[in-house]
């Protein structure tokens, strides 16, 4: 049994709810910071006197920070108590976003967004471990899903508010608001999450042993491949709606809301399903993803059904809490690094999906071809899952024969 598996919560029910709320609030802040840049692209370009494609580089700098920071900070912080590490990561995040708000030039902004992205994956990894550690064993994935719910709510509510604030006042105030939310998370976690003196301490080199586990790599690969279809469709959603469905540009924000609703449902469903089915929940979610992706091109022909389909696309986020919990189960003593690396895998999916979708569109297959590309990547995730099951059975058979 891993150190996240405790028979009973070590906090009161009231504190349990408040801790999960505080951890989700940190995810809410991160979600606003990650996604609001897209909605404020024009304002940032005007404020820094750069082109919108250059703002795209700013977005990429943040994503690069996530990929680099997730394993790096998990290894560096391995020897610290998780409570301390959580607090430091959110202070770091607040400072990174404050620096972004004050950035005077394009190159400074690139650096600030890279720095702001560094704590992203490590925070979600450690927050998920903390949420699981205070939960009964049969509610671990549900608790992880509630932490990740912050990201979905940010997409649903936070980003429209941040975009509105950036348009009415300045995009810099949106960055500053994220810093305030991050500091509120620090205060809430410090007030409600008690120290855990019996928590096992790790050594940085021991954390690296996570990558000696084939099941860790396979779980990360499922996320990087199987999750990319969602990003493939989402990245080209606006032009698909206007060019294929005939949706007026003024209604595009409704599509973002629909996607956010799906994300909220997915975060809840993914954790609930994994608590009941364990790793067997993953192929169920991937098959659902295949169905959703294959029906999207058909739904895109209807102004009504396309919004139903967009909600369904958002529910594909159910993979996140399922895979996050799977990594906790297979990482042995190197849980911090494995859990943090999950978000590096998701950012890989965020890069892979739009790239594959762009290739299909450029080849002349049309805007709705993103659905078929997404179905193919979900099938790829199923193949990786099958490989993981085969490898796990082979390992058990080998141990049994010894």
Segments from the language model and where they lie:
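Helix-breaking motifs and short loop linkers at transmembrane-helix boundaries and internal kinks
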Residues: 49, 81, 102-108, 246, ...
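Paired small-residue
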Residues: 92, 96-99, 107-116, 304-312
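C-terminal transmembrane helical hairpin of 12-TM major facilitator-type secondary transporters
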Residues: 280-323
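A late C-terminal transmembrane helix in Major Facilitator Superfamily
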Residues: 330-366, 374
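Helix-to-loop junctions at the C-terminal end of transmembrane segments
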Residues: 70-81, 266-278, 361-362
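Cytoplasmic helix-loop-helix junction between adjacent transmembrane helices
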Residues: 112-150
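Helix-loop-helix hairpin linking two adjacent transmembrane segments in secondary transporters
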Residues: 106-108, 136-194, 240
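Conserved MFS/SLC helix-loop-helix module at the cytosolic interface between two early adjacent transmembrane helices
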Residues: 68-107
